[in-house]
A protein has these predicted regions:
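Short, surface-exposed coil-to-beta transition loops
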Residues: 56-58, 73, 86-91
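Short, cysteine-centered beta-strand-loop-beta hairpins and adjacent loop/turn segments enriched
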Residues: 78-85
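A short hydrophobic beta-strand element
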Residues: 67-76
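Short acidic-aromatic low-complexity motifs
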Residues: 1-19
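Short beta-strand edge/turn micro-motifs at domain boundaries
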Residues: 92-115
Length: 119
């Protein structure tokens, strides 16, 4: 989660397998749905550019790991260029294979996300 908080998209992508997929819940155009590694990187770069610090800080609150699956409850915080504060709660489910993240499911408060990024 530390690498996310720095906003270094290339470093973030280095943790993903070449065929990784990242799914975000909800119906937010440009954010929700399934993305491949390249699409996810483009989305991250775009979102990071909307923040004052160039990143959305992520703080893990609780972890559960079993086999190749890791679930993480997380809180984010960022001051946005539009003057709003992005402070969301997430549940991430990671599937790790051969030392790389292969699949991610991201559950979050979509209404807060929509209000901050699109409102």
């Amino acid at each position: 989660m530390e690498v996310f908080s720095r906003g270094d998209v290339d470093a973030i992508l280095s943790y993903l397998a070449p065929t990784a997929t990242w799914w975000v819940g909800g119906g937010i155009e440009g954010i929700s749905g399934t993305k491949n590694k390249e699409e996810f990187g483009a989305m991250l770069a775009g979102l990071s550019a909307t923040t004052k610090s160039g990143a959305i800080a992520l703080k893990p609150l609780a972890w559960t790991a079993e086999g190749e699956r890791v679930a993480v409850e997380t809180e984010s915080y960022s001051e946005m260029n539009n003057g709003k504060i992005y402070n969301n709660l997430y549940h991430f489910v990671f599937v790790v294979r051969d030392g790389k993240i292969d699949e991610v499911k991201e559950f979050l408060d979509t209404e807060h996300t929509r209000a901050v990024f699109l409102g």
